[in-house]
A protein has these predicted regions:
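Nucleotide phosphate-binding/pyrophosphate-handling subdomain across enzymes
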Residues: 2-3, 15-23, 132, 266-368
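Phosphate-binding loop of NTP-binding sites
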Residues: 3, 19-22, 43, 59-63, ...
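Glycine-rich Rossmann-fold phosphate-binding loop(s) that bind the pyrophosphate
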Residues: 9-10
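Residue-level signal for inorganic ion chemistry
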Residues: 20, 68, 109, 138, ...
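NAD(P)-binding Rossmann-fold cofactor-contacting core
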Residues: 25-42
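C-terminal helical cap/extension that packs against the catalytic core
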Residues: 43, 359-414
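Glycine-rich, highly charged phosphate/nucleotide-binding loops
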Residues: 48-60
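Beta-strand->loop->alpha-helix junctions that form or flank phosphate-binding loops
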Residues: 55-56, 92-96, 229-247, 298-302, ...
Length: 446
C-alpha cells in the first residue's frame, strides 16, 4: 500500500480522496488555506479521521509520502510542489490517478478552444455506440469520480487541460485530439513554446495502434503531425485533404484510401460558426477512428445542442439578441464569438489577467462591434489595445450587472449583445459558469 499526499482540497482533491478510499489506499491532504473547513471536506469525502496539513508545511516529514496527487488548479511552482520535487516524490495529476484505475478505452481531447463542445459531441456520439460511455475530465466531472465505474467495454471521453497534461505520466488514450493552439495561460506556462509542448504531450505515450486527430489549418499542429508514433488524422475547414476530414462547401467529408464519403452538412447541426464546424469534424474523425458507424455519427451530430456558456443564445428583448459566451476566456475564443454574431454587436469584455495580448481580438471589431463595455482587472489593458487600433467606442464599467443595463439602453433593434470576456473570471467571480449565470439572470430581468 502507498501513502499519498493530495495537494489541493477542492473538487478534484475530494474526488481523488474518495477514489483512494475505495481502493484501500492511505492519504494526507494539504491545502494552502489555513482556515480551510476540514469538517466539511471530511463529510464530502465520507471519512472522519483524515489528516490535514493547512498553510505552513515546514514541519512535515515528506518521507511519509510515496506519491503526490495534485489538483489541476495548483501550480507546480508553488512552494509545496517545489518541496515535493526536492524530495523526489512522483507527481500525478487527477487524470493520471484516474487513468491507472480505468479498465476501458480513453479518448483524450485538448486544445486552446473548442474542447468542451468537441468533448460533449464526441461523448454524445459514443454513448450511442459503446456499451458504456463516460464524460469526464475538465468538463465539470472529475475523472476520478468515474474511473472505478469503468470496465473493459467502457469508453471515457475526457476533456484534458494543459494544467492536467503537466502531470501526465502513463496516461495513454487510444484516440487523442489537439483542436488548435493559440496563446493562453501564459501566466502559468510562461512561454508559448512551453504551452505548445504541454499540449502536444498528450500523444507522448501513444503507439502505432493509436490515433491522433489534428487541425490541419493550424501551422503548429500541421508540423507536429509529422512526429507522433501513432496514426495521424487531419481535419480542415479550408483545405481538401488527401486523407482526413474536410469541408467542401457546406458538406463535411471523410476521405480515406482515395474514397470520399459525405457525412453531413452544416445545415444538419444547430451549431453555428466555422470554429464549430471544425469541432464537428474533429468529433467525426475521432469517432470514425473508434469504429462508430457513419449513421450513428450523423444522428449524434443532428441531435446535439450547443454547450452552455459557449455562444449560448439567451433571449431576444426589444428586438435585441443576447448571447452568453462566458466560456470565451481567451482572445482566440472571443474572436470566434465576435465573428459568429449575425449583426452589429455591443460587446462585454474583460476579467482576470492571464497575460494575453488583446490586439488580434480588437482587430476584429471593425464593422462588427459598435460598442465595448469593459469590466475586470484587464479593462485598462484592453482599452490600450483599442487605442492602438483606433477603436474609441469603449466604456469602463464597474460590474457585469451595470454592463448589461448599459448594453440594453444603448442597443437598437436588430443588434446583438454579447458577453465574451476574452479573459478568465477569477477576479470577480468563482468561475466562468457563475459569470455566465449572472449575465443570463440580468438579461432575463430586463
Amino acid at each position: 500500500m502507498s501513502r499519498y499526499l493530495i495537494v489541493g482540497a477542492g473538487r478534484s482533491g475530494i474526488n481523488a480522496a474518495q477514489l483512494l478510499i475505495k481502493v484501500g489506499e492511505d492519504f494526507i491532504i494539504y491545502d494552502g488555506n489555513e482556515n480551510f473547513d476540514t469538517a466539511a471536506a471530511c463529510e464530502k469525502i465520507g471519512r472522519d479521521n483524515i489528516e490535514f496539513i493547512l498553510g505552513d508545511f515546514s514541519g512535515f516529514d515528506f518521507s511519509r509520502v510515496d506519491i503526490c496527487v495534485v489538483s489541476p488548479g495548483v501550480s507546480l511552482e508553488m512552494p509545496i510542489m517545489k518541496a515535493v520535487k526536492e524530495h523526489n516524490i512522483p507527481i500525478w495529476g487527477e487524470v493520471e490517478l484516474a487513468y491507472r484505475h480505468d479498465k476501458g478505452t480513453v479518448i483524450g481531447i485538448t486544445g486552446t478552444n473548442g474542447k468542451t463542445t468537441t468533448t460533449s459531441l464526441t461523448y454524445d456520439i459514443m454513448k450511442r455506440h459503446a456499451k458504456k460511455a463516460l464524460l469526464v475530465g475538465n468538463i465539470e466531472i472529475p475523472y476520478t469520480g468515474y474511473a472505478l465505474e469503468s470496465d473493459k467495454d467502457s469508453v471515457a471521453v475526457a476533456e484534458i487541460s494543459s494544467f492536467q497534461l503537466e502531470t501526465m505520466v502513463t496516461f495513454k488514450p487510444h484516440v487523442t485530439a489537439i483542436l488548435n493552439i493559440t496563446p493562453d495561460h501564459l501566466d502559468r506556462h510562461k512561454t508559448l513554446e512551453n504551452y505548445i509542448a504541454i499540449k502536444e504531450s498528450i500523444t507522448k505515450n501513444q503507439d502505432e495502434n493509436d490515433f491522433c486527430v489534428l487541425n490541419y489549418n493550424d501551422p503548429v499542429l500541421r508540423e507536429f503531425g509529422k512526429t507522433p508514433r501513432c496514426k495521424v488524422i487531419f481535419f480542415s475547414s479550408s483545405e481538401e485533404l488527401e486523407s482526413g476530414v474536410f469541408l467542401r462547401g457546406d458538406t463535411m467529408i471523410i476521405k480515406e484510401n482515395g474514397v470520399e464519403t459525405p457525412v453531413c452538412t452544416t445545415k444538419d447541426t444547430s451549431l453555428v460558426g466555422m470554429h464549430n464546424y471544425e469541432n464537428i469534424m474533429a468529433a467525426i474523425a475521432m469517432t470514425h477512428a473508434m469504429g462508430v458507424p457513419l449513421d450513428t455519427i450523423r444522428q449524434g451530430i443532428k441531435e446535439f445542442t450547443a454547450v452552455e456558456h459557449r455562444i449560448e443564445f439567451v433571449a431576444e428583448k426589444n428586438g435585441v439578441k443576447y448571447y452568453n459566451d462566458s466560456k470565451g476566456t481567451n482572445p482566440d475564443a472571443a474572436i470566434k464569438a465576435v465573428c459568429a454574431m449575425p449583426s452589429p454587436t455591443i460587446l462585454i469584455g474583460g476579467g482576470y489577467d492571464k497575460k494575453s495580448s488583446y490586439d488580434e481580438w480588437v482587430a476584429t471589431f471593425e464593422g462588427r462591434v459598435k460598442e465595448l463595455l469593459l469590466i475586470g482587472k484587464t479593462k485598462y489593458d484592453i482599452a490600450a489595445a483599442c487605442d492602438r487600433a483606433g477603436f474609441k467606442a469603449y466604456k469602463f464599467v464597474d460590474t457585469l450587472e451595470e454592463a448589461v443595463s448599459i448594453a440594453a439602453a444603448d442597443a437598437e433593434s436588430g443588434d446583438c449583445v454579447l458577453l465574451s470576456p476574452a479573459c478568465a473570471s477569477w477576479d470577480m467571480f468563482k468561475c466562468y459558469q457563475q459569470r455566465g449565470e449572472i449575465f443570463k439572470d440580468c438579461v432575463r430581468a430586463l
